[in-house]
């Protein structure tokens, strides 16, 4: 039986990494948080790997790895998914299971971009930057801005999912202030949205090139708008790679080189 890699996924890099691992001869167990994510990310690879829907808690991940569920963990969760990254790194350290963090490449935005180190800090800064705000930070984080509805005109772009809508409504947003859309979006499309809603400030997070931040920020730059960027948490002390090839090489260092196979179609 081949060596098994647990791929903690949920972003667009997941299928790319899975394909690279499969081509290198590893068995892959990929995780996503929702059934929608499974279909969206892994429908073309579903016959080549195992996809587990639902996240791990610390006890369930510990049990899975302790029982031989995987020989290595490749963490390709979102750059802002700090909880699962810390959880996985802690469990792997306790079990001496190799852990590798895939960190998508960052991007340097234009001069004049305003930065905040947290969502709460961003909310405190917003009233000094403008009054018509477009939030593109994910529905779960909108709660940090709920207190600003009486002072500012807030709009939010969220995923077209029921749980996202519920989180946005609980944060005080109305149907008129929500855009339920699934990325990716072009620079021109971002520009048209910002113009249509007469936005003065774009709020986004440093989620990297693959996260669509370039198209958003450059659209705001085209229109002369301000951008408030929430900094990415630093993966302190973690073994990190930023390309699929580098991820495979580290797997080979830890697990040995397996017999590669034909590319997965």
Where are these regions (language model features)?
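N-terminal basic/disordered segments at the start of proteins
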Residues: 5-35
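Short, polar loop motifs at secondary-structure junctions
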Residues: 32-38, 102-106, 139-141, 160-163, ...
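Anionic-ligand binding region
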Residues: 136-178
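Glycine-rich, highly charged phosphate/nucleotide-binding loops
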Residues: 49-65, 179-189
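Glycine/small-residue-rich loop that forms an oxyanion/phosphate-binding "nest" at active or ligand-binding sites
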Residues: 62-122
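N-terminal beta-loop-helix "entrance" segment that forms/cooperates
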Residues: 29-54, 111-114, 167-171
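C-terminal functional extensions of proteins
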Residues: 194-197, 201, 206-209, 213, ...
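A C-terminal functional module that forms or caps the active site or interfaces directly
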Residues: 169-176, 181-192, 196-197, 201, ...
